[in-house]
Amino acid sequence: MAISRGDKVRIKRPESYWYNDVGTVASIDTSGIRYPVVVRFEKVNYNGISGSEGGINTNNFAQAELEPA
C-alpha cells in the first residue's frame, strides 16, 4: 500500500480514539520509526492539553494500521 502526503486514510487500530474515522496524511517519516505516518483529523480527541483548545487532532500510525478512504 503506497500512502502519500495528502491522502485520505481510514484508521484500523482498534484501541485508537479515531478507530474507523477518516483523516488526512500530514507527513510520513522514512527513518524507520515504528509509527511513521502522521494523520490529521477534523475533530479533536478527549485529551485537553495546556495551550490548546480542547485536545489533539493529530496522531502517528503504522502503515499497516491505515487503509485508503
UniProtKB/Swiss-Prot annotation:
Entries under Gene3D superfamilies matching the protein: 2.30.30.50
Compartment(s) where it occurs, according to its Swiss-Prot or TrEMBL record: Cellular thylakoid membrane
GO BP, one annotated term: photosynthesis
InterPro entries: Elect_transpt_acc-like_dom_sf (IPR008990), PSI_PsaE (IPR003375)
GO cellular component, one term: photosystem I reaction center
Record membrane topology: Peripheral membrane protein
Keyword list, A-Z: Membrane, Photosynthesis, Photosystem I, Thylakoid
Main location: membrane
Coiled coil: none
Purpose: Stabilizes the interaction between PsaC and the PSI core, assists the docking of the ferredoxin to PSI and interacts with ferredoxin-NADP oxidoreductase.
Family stated for the protein in its record: Belongs to the PsaE family.
Identification of the protein by name: Photosystem I reaction center subunit IV
Organism (species): Synechococcus sp. (strain CC9311)
Gene: psaE
